């Protein structure tokens, strides 16, 4: 029995799509109850667990967003979970709210994928959100304009 990811030749669009799903699907049971955080275990991060879990939630979006933009059918079950997580994560009244950021905050760098989502898949990533959530997403992302960031790869 081979390793389905290792044995994937990654030669075609469908190969890459299949690999992304194979890597992200096992994360679904690790999502928090409101799906705004992803607990991958204990980390060596120098920031609190809730921020590490928000980071873990955001990283798969780098694959999910292009799949949404490319209208890949296989992304739908993944997107349903991440869509629910975004709604919870930007809601200040939700216990899984991603919170108020501070200068040099890890969550600032994670905001980039949300911009990519709105640019590449605006319908799914923004316009399909409830109006209240659109405003909350804007407010949460807008925090970046009021905080310092290191002069490194965070400032794309």
Descriptions of predicted regions:
Residues 1-55, 77-85:
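Low-complexity, Ser/Thr/Pro/Gly-enriched N-terminal "stalk/linker" regions
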Residues 53-54, 64-66, 75, 79-156:
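Aromatic-lined, polymer-binding surfaces characteristic
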Residues 69-71:
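Short, well-structured hydrophobic secondary-structure segments
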